[in-house]
């Protein structure tokens, strides 16, 4: 099963994307629908809301008067936190009940308006955020019958746009027509979501990339999301998770592949992470179990390698043991390159040459043999520590 997160502010167009994904075959778990369900008359949720906000949030028939609740719950952060503290746990419990009943091959789209606020984004192998300019969103919401001041209050009460963008693996711009948004959503479903689902099911990585591209500042944002996703999947077994390699070096051309290192206590611990990482979208590459040794004892260079199943964000996830040469050098190498422009240029030349050879990684090894010695000399001189 693939679970993807879908979110967007009020009026952004999230419901249109959700409906499109449903038409494409996705199982929609709608946070708004569940939020209404858990506060229906006779529920524990409604009783808790009445206790917190008063009897005047009820209609004459005993149902929830949503505008009356909103007028109380969105006046300040404390009241909003009270509302969220009641509703969110109930929604989470009901959501899990629905997901547990879904078949294993399904693609589950979890439509969660407050995905940022709940901190749930790292739980998903893919997060889709729908966005639109605030003035466009206000206009849309007012057309639905909401007062403009209330619309602005609701928008301002939700996470700011920068925070939504930070969790987005995919950002769908809905500043155009509804038809344009539907087309974008369909394209995303068939060209990224379904291939990701197939790859996770088959425990299969996306093909390797062998082309240098100009430095992209978005690599750091992508890496931050992957790091958080991996930390969530690994829990305490990951002693640390770091963005390493060329995409972590500011200003340097690189393959469009984000490298991440997980530090663990032992290779046994690394093996225990195989299934959690695969479910998070990073299946294991079974045949790679060691780095190229740069010291006399090859046993010190054992590792595990996982790669991304997401065709839209290639990544390599290296798992190495704390304190061993491979783990230390991966951290050192990134810092050494960032601190030394001349070394960056040398390495870039070596990479460009390696791209002309049949085996890219092997072709770089002669350069790395000398780089290993030079990097540790720099570490000794500068007092570098991991």
Give residue spans per PLM region:
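Helical scaffold of the NTase/Pol beta-like nucleotidyltransferase catalytic core
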Residues: 1-4, 186-242
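Walker A/P-loop
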Residues: 15
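ATP-dependent small-molecule kinase phosphotransfer cores
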Residues: 36-107
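ATP-dependent NMP and nucleoside kinases share a basic, alpha-helical "lid"
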Residues: 92-101, 107-143
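Small-molecule kinase domains that catalyze NTP-dependent phosphoryl transfer to phosphate-bearing small molecules
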Residues: 94-95, 121-123, 142-193
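Active-site nucleotide-donor binding segment shared across nucleotidyl transfer reactions
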Residues: 112-115, 227-271
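Metal-dependent nucleotidyltransferase catalytic core
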Residues: 136, 143-154, 216-230, 264-310
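Catalytic cores of NTP-dependent nucleotidyl/adenyl transfer enzymes across multiple folds
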Residues: 319, 323-386
């Amino acid at each position: 099963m693939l679970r993807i997160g879908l979110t967007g502010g009020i009026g952004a167009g999230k419901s249109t994307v959700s409906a499109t994904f449903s038409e494409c075959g996705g199982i929609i778990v709608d946070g708004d629908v569940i939020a209404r369900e858990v506060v229906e008359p006779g529920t524990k949720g409604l009783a808790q809301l009445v206790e917190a906000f008063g009897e005047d949030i009820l209609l004459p028939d005993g149902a929830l008067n949503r505008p009356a609740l909103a007028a109380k719950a969105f006046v300040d952060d404390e009241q909003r936190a009270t509302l969220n503290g009641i509703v969110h746990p109930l929604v989470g419990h009901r959501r899990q009940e629905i997901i547990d009943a879904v078949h294993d091959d399904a693609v589950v789209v979890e439509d969660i308006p407050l995905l940022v606020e709940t901190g749930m984004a790292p739980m998903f192998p893919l997060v889709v955020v729908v966005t639109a300019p605030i003035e466009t969103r206000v206009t849309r919401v007012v057309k639905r019958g909401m007062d403009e001041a209330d619309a602005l209050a609701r928008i301002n009460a939700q996470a700011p746009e920068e925070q939504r963008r930070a969790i987005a693996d995919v950002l769908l711009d809905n500043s155009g027509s509804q038809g344009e948004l539907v087309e974008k959503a369909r394209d995303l479903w068939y060209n990224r979501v379904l291939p990701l689902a197939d790859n996770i099911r088959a425990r299969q990585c996306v093909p390797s990339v062998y082309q240098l591209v100009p430095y992209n500042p978005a690599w750091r944002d992508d890496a931050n999301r992957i790091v958080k996703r991996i930390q969530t999947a690994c829990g305490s077994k990951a002693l640390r998770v770091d963005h390493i390699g060329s995409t972590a070096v500011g200003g340097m051309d690189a393959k469009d592949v984000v490298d991440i290192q997980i530090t663990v206590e032992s290779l046994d611990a690394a093996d225990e992470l195989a299934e959690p990482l695969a479910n998070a979208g990073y299946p294991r590459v079974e045949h790679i179990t060691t780095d190229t040794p740069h010291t006399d004892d090859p046993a010190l260079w054992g590792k595990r390698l996982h790669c991304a199943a997401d065709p839209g964000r290639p990544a390599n996830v290296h798992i190495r043991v704390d304190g061993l040469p491979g783990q230390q050098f991966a951290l050192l190498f990134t810092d050494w390159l960032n601190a030394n422009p001349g070394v960056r240029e040398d390495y870039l030349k070596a990479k460009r040459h390696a791209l002309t050879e049949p085996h890219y990684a092997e072709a770089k090894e002669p350069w790395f043999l000398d780089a290993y010695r030079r990097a540790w000399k720099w570490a000794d001189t500068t007092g570098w520590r991991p």
